[in-house]
Amino acid sequence: MWHNMAMTRLWFRCGLAVFLLVLAGSAFAAPRLERERCTFKPPRGDRIECFTLIVPENREQPEGREVRLKVAVLKAKRTVGAEPLIYLSGGPGDAPLMASSPGADALAEGDWWNETAAIRRRRDVVILSQRGAGGATPNLDCFDPRTTDPAKARRRAVTEQQERDILVRCRAGLDKRKIDLAMYTTPALADDVSDLASAMSLAKINIYGVSYGTRWGLEVMRRYPDLVRAAVLDGVYPPQVNGEQNEPEIVRQAFEQLYAECTADPLCRERHPGLRSAVEGKIDAAERAPVELTLQLEDGPHPVRLDGSKFLMVLLHMMREGEAALIPETVAAVQRGDVRLLKMFAEDLESNDGGLLEQNAQQFDGLYNSIECRETWATVDRAARRKMIETSGVYGFNARTSKSPAFCPVWRVPAAPATERQPVKAAVPTLLLSGTFDWLTPPAWGREAARY
């Protein structure tokens, strides 16, 4: 009898131990939110809550490394229980919760409170960091080892071989930390959104994706169609599209639209009758004799030489910023020796995106490399792309400057399976937005996504 009772107690203890282990394991694997102190300063009358979302790096190994993602909830004016709007940022690698300089307020910099005021009348707006980007741990960003200040790294002149060496060291450092770059993908980011909804006890969400964030949002809709109540996709970038393959033709089409609209407008046609030849001629002339400017930036004046590629970059930036109508006058002014308009837009481009000075930290963005090398460059026909660049005249100058063909072999990530490149078919009410002159996500891509 005592033997049976002892055995019963033993089995009970063993069973309890196993149960507790299973419970602990499942609790560890489950996504969870931890409240944290907000560093953002909302305007009077507005409220914000800040959290860290904790999820597994590899969901097939939930006991392994954790990923920590910043979350900001801009609270609705009224608590009515409406499904929140989750903002999906672009890039990949954009970090809307990270300020451009220490001590600054990222939400104030992005004018988030004003931009979301109408939505927040009855819905919370939730901003989620991208895994691997700013605001997340681990962060895959790499900077020039001569400085840890991104702004200074951005101003340093480095050769392409030095850039490559930086990435080699960065990749080796990530390997040493046992960070699995194969887990920093669009599907993994989509799973993070689902885990966020689960941790917030949300049965339904609305999503607003911008640029790359539209591809992120489409993947959420593919993987979790019952989770998404409605979606707005702004600057549509569907998974079946490879933007790098035909970039020169996309750039050409944006300018063809500009030429056509100028011809159709009596005033533009009268003032700029030879717009095509003026634009192409000035870009080509800058390639042979760069336009010299001094940009007035936050950290002081910086001389820059705009060759054909950089001159084209400024014009493309004007298109994306809704200033395409000023391109004819900007080019005409430069022909007269007046570079004031060109300088103004060059300063705006360098301040916001970089790319005109010798170097900028964007190309050391590890998450960008991980996703673009895996999902885009792995399927690019490089010989066909080179031929298109060579035969596209000035419209191929921008594509010619891409470093990804040289950097992706260094980054060493596996190619995405073909299933991820299939169109997304989801019965979710969706508003697709595309800018007429948005050459990075042209209107044709929105029409392509709408077919499904």
Where are each of the predicted segments found?
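Glycine-rich nucleophile elbow surrounding the catalytic serine of serine-hydrolase chemistry
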Residues: 191, 209-221
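Catalytic-loop region of hydrolases
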Residues: 26-157, 276-287, 412-416
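A catalytic-pocket lid/entrance helix-loop region that shapes and gates access to the active site
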Residues: 114, 141-151, 217-282, 313, ...
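Conserved alpha/beta-hydrolase "acid-adjacent" motif
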Residues: 439-445
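Conserved acidic catalytic loop of the alpha/beta-hydrolase fold
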Residues: 175, 190-205
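Alpha/beta-hydrolase fold active-site neighborhood
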Residues: 280-425
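Short beta-strand/loop motif that positions the catalytic acidic residue
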Residues: 426, 432-434
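Short beta-strand immediately N-terminal to the catalytic nucleophile in serine-hydrolase-like folds
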Residues: 207-209, 234, 433
